[in-house]
Each structure stands twice: as structure tokens, then as C-alpha cells.
Amino acid sequence: MTSTGSTRYDGDSWDLASSVGVTATMVAAARAMATRAENPLINDPYAEPLVRAVGVDLLTRLATGEFNVADLDDDPQRPLGPLGDVADNMAVRTRFFDDFFLDATRAGLEQVVILASGLDARAYRLPWPPQTVVYEIDLPQVIEFKSRTLADLGAAPTADRRVVAVDLREDWPAALRAAGFDPNQPTAWSAEGLLGYLPPEAQDRLLDTVTELSAPGSRLAAECLSSVDPGEEEQIKERMQEVSARWRAHGFDVDMVGLVYFGDRNEAVPYLSDRGWLLTSTPLPELRAANGLAPAAVDDDGPSVDMLYVSGTLYTTPRPDPAP
């Protein structure tokens, strides 16, 4: 299992309406849907206007409620049951990271780093403790768009928000330090909806760098897939292709398979554990149950993999690599 299956390439670029960047807009649309729920688990008042500002028609209609995600599930021969759970799944994912950040900062951590922040508006909507500094890292065009749009809305950050406009494939640690980040102070890090969009070696490099920049007591939250058997990878691709076809049928041309990287990769939890992180992982079904949601629709023909929500603390200094 060596083929990545991705149409991505070194040095590729994007904005919030194209390539992998559009996934940030999809996520924001799902947050807007979750915010409109009858008994919402989250409240993101900025999700809908940010999606509208990007201007992808179908995502705007989903965010505003003009179009229902259930309308995508219009093939009785091949129902996409799990797609109908997208708003609830996004609600519990968002709540997981919200709670992680609030727990960490209320425990005394004053530095927060959001990797690949996209249209994340936590710096504007969470009740951060005083002295909290929130660093957002993303491409310059993504950072500029979000900052300008939120300013036009009259939104004001609820923490000391510092933008780090840099590609994660470049020297982002230097840019982060230049923005005032202190690696000698404990940090709360998030990698939400990120790892699957990195090549395997880039994932390792990112996790190594985060560890190197983390003082003992730092915390980390991430989203990752459980281990995927070789036979299940093709099932995942087929299911993603079916979902992409439904999107295209409604005027939104996106190739989900081409945006992610498949193939062998280190599992994030044991990889980080070997580097001094003490972690717990919660599968999505358990996270739904913990938030009072009914079990999601099950795809009997789909792969038996779960999304894992991981959080924990760096309890020691990073372990040096063994001598050759």
C-alpha cells in the first residue's frame, strides 16, 4: 500500500474555494448547520457569514439552510446515510476542540497554536481567560481573507490574536517565534482536520516539530483515523468518490480522493506516545454518545474505520533519537 492516490503535489497552492482549501469552507458550512440545530452543541455565529463571503454556491446554501444536506442523499439504490450525520459529527468535533482549549487555558496555559486554522473563529468566539495569546497559522491568502471578512463584520477577538501567515511546508516555526511564541512556555496545540491532508512523511515532520517546540506540560489535540487495513483503503476511496459524485450532481465540483494522502503512515497516537506525550483517544461514536447524540447511521458496506479524537499532555522533555 504505497500509492497516495492524491492529485496534490509539492508546492501546490489553493484558496478557500479551491483544492484542499475548500475543505475549510465545507467545515465552516457544517459548523453553521450545527449552530442552527434545534438544541445546538456549539455556537459559531461567524461560520455562516464566512462561508457566504467565500462564495461557493452550494456551500452557501447549506450554511444558510436554503439547502439541506439530506438532499444530497437522493439515490435510493446507494444511500449515503453517514453524510446525513455531518452536522452532528461536526458539532461534536467542534465541541471537543472547544473544550480542549478552554480546559487547557483555564489550567494556566497562555499560549494557543491553531495549525492550519482555515475559517476557525475560536479567537473571536471562545471566552478565553485573560493573558491568552492565540496564534493562527495558515496560508497568507487564507489569513488575510478571514481577518478582513471578520473585520468587515465588526467582530473583535476575545484573546490576543496573532496571525502567522505561512505555509506549513515552509519554516513556520521561525514565523511563529517571530510572532512572539515562546517555546519555553507550555502551549495548547490543535491539529483539527489536518493530518490526513499531509503526506505521511510531512505528518511525522509536523508532529516532531510540535514536540520540539513544546515545553513539558504542553497539551495537544488532534483528529486522526484509526488504523486502516490495506483492503479497506479502496473501500474508503470508493465511498469518497461516491460522495464527490453527489456533490458534483448539485453543482459543486470537488474530488475528495485527490485531496487526501493515502498509503502507509505512522499512526499519530503511538508516534506521539514514543515522544513523551501521554494521550487518550476517543472514537467518534463514543464522542457522539458522550454528547447525548444517537448512534450515527452505519454503512454496512463501508470500511470499519473510525475517526479518533486525541488529546493529551507532554509529560517529559522530548526523547532524543537513539545514537546510530
UniProtKB/Swiss-Prot annotation:
Keywords annotated in UniProt: Methyltransferase, S-adenosyl-L-methionine, Transferase
Claim: S-adenosyl-L-methionine is one of the keywords in the record: yes
Segments crossing the lipid bilayer: none
Top-level class of the enzyme under EC nomenclature: transferase
InterPro entries recorded: Ppm1/Ppm2/Tcmp, SAM-dependent_MTases_sf, SAM_mthyl_Trfase_ML2640-like
GO biological process, one term: methylation
Binding-site list for S-adenosyl-L-methionine: 138, 167-168
Residues in the signal sequence: none
UniProt EC number: 2.1.1.-
Gene3D superfamilies the record matches: Vaccinia Virus protein VP39
Gene Ontology MF terms: methyltransferase activity
Keyword Methyltransferase: yes
Entry's family note: Belongs to the UPF0677 family.
Function: Exhibits S-adenosyl-L-methionine-dependent methyltransferase activity.
Protein name from the UniProt record: Putative S-adenosyl-L-methionine-dependent methyltransferase MMAR_1059
Organism: Mycobacterium marinum (strain ATCC BAA-535 / M)
